[in-house]
């Protein structure tokens, strides 16, 4: 199974983990964009992270991981539905492209910005957590987010190349199995030290069972059923209609005239094009467009 997450726990500890490996869905996401090769792994890290987090944060709806700033890469977004539908984009905006984006830290790429984690549930209230870009990597920033918001020790290892993305996540839980503070600290440090040895080659080539045995055999690891993921974009014509409607009738028809009788609405996630002509706007603003 090449596009899946695998939850696991360590026996007789209060530590849980999650493993993600994505290939087909990641390649589909990248293929819909004209990204510099040196930026593709960064998008892969965001896609892998949102897949891992989707198993940690229980929700019905959409989980969005986004960073926005004023640097060479002003916007990165990855989102995941509770059904395992993944999307992701990087936007360079008006910035002059760099010859090479590799080797730069996340704050150097984003500039003055903030990382947000948003849950849009199908029912209930929207939730958003914000964290400053105080770590060099996405994994560092997310660890800080969990330390501040959830007050749970959390560590991520994220990897990506042109064909695969994935990662490993460990999280300490409130005391249930083990109450001794020194023992809890020792178990956490051991798990992190073992996870630090993981390599991209292992992550992308070994079955989950084999990888977890290789990394954590001495801790006793229990693996749960895999959860599958795929690329799927939720865009549709109705969203384009809503965007045009939000302009108001006067501004919408002015835009129609500027664009020679056809308003184009493009989805940045999948490249789908939606065109709206005068008769479409007439129906929209008469209340009969569906």
Curated annotation (Swiss-Prot):
<keyword id="KW-1015">Disulfide bond</keyword>
<dbReference type="InterPro" id="IPR023212">
    <property type="entry name" value="Hsp33_helix_hairpin_bin_dom_sf"/>
</dbReference>
<keyword id="KW-0143">Chaperone</keyword>
<keyword id="KW-0963">Cytoplasm</keyword>
<comment type="similarity">
    <text>Belongs to the HSP33 family.</text>
</comment>
<dbReference type="GO" id="GO:0005737">
    <property type="term" value="C:cytoplasm"/>
</dbReference>
<comment type="function">
    <text>Redox regulated molecular chaperone. Protects both thermally unfolding and oxidatively damaged proteins from irreversible aggregation. Plays an important role in the bacterial defense system toward oxidative stress.</text>
</comment>
<dbReference type="GO" id="GO:0042026">
    <property type="term" value="P:protein refolding"/>
</dbReference>
<dbReference type="Pfam" id="PF01430">
    <property type="entry name" value="HSP33"/>
</dbReference>
<dbReference type="InterPro" id="IPR016154">
    <property type="entry name" value="Heat_shock_Hsp33_C"/>
</dbReference>
<feature type="disulfide bond" description="Redox-active">
    <location>
        <begin position="267"/>
        <end position="270"/>
    </location>
</feature>
<feature type="disulfide bond" description="Redox-active">
    <location>
        <begin position="233"/>
        <end position="235"/>
    </location>
</feature>
<keyword id="KW-0676">Redox-active center</keyword>
<protein>
    <recommendedName>
        <fullName>33 kDa chaperonin</fullName>
    </recommendedName>
</protein>
<keyword id="KW-0862">Zinc</keyword>
<dbReference type="GO" id="GO:0051082">
    <property type="term" value="F:unfolded protein binding"/>
</dbReference>
<dbReference type="GO" id="GO:0044183">
    <property type="term" value="F:protein folding chaperone"/>
</dbReference>
<dbReference type="InterPro" id="IPR016153">
    <property type="entry name" value="Heat_shock_Hsp33_N"/>
</dbReference>
<dbReference type="InterPro" id="IPR000397">
    <property type="entry name" value="Heat_shock_Hsp33"/>
</dbReference>
């Amino acid at each position: 199974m090449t596009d899946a997450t695998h939850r696991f726990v360590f026996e007789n500890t209060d530590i849980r983990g999650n493993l993600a490996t994505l290939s087909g869905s990641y390649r589909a996401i990248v293929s819909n964009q004209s990204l510099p090769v040196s930026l593709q792994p960064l998008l892969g890290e965001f896609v892998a992270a949102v897949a891992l987090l989707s198993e940690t944060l229980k929700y019905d709806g959409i989980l969005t991981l986004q960073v926005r700033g004023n640097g060479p890469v002003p916007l990165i977004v990855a989102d995941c539905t509770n059904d395992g539908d993944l999307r992701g984009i990087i936007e360079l905006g008006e910035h002059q492209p760099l010859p090479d984006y590799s080797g730069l830290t996340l704050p150097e790429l984003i500039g003055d910005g903030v990382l947000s984690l948003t849950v849009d549930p199908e029912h209930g209230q929207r939730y958003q957590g914000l964290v400053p870009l105080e770590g060099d990597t996405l994994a560092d920033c997310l660890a800080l987010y969990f330390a501040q918001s959830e007050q749970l020790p959390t560590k991520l290892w994220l990897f990506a190349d042109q064909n695969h993305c994935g990662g490993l996540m460990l999280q300490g839980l409130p005391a249930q199995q083990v109450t001794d503070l020194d023992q809890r600290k020792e178990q956490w440090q051991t798990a992190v030290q073992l996870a630090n040895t993981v390599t991209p080659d292992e992550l992308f080539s070994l079955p989950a069972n084999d990888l977890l045995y290789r990394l954590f055999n001495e801790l006793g690891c229990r693996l749960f059923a895999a959860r599958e993921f795929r690329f799927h974009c939720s865009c549709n014509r109705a969203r384009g209609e809503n965007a045009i409607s939000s302009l108001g009738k006067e501004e919408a028809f002015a835009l129609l005239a500027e664009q020679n009788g056809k308003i184009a609405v493009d989805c940045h996630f999948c490249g789908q094009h939606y065109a709206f002509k005068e008769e479409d706007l007439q129906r929209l603003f008469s209340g009969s467009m569906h």
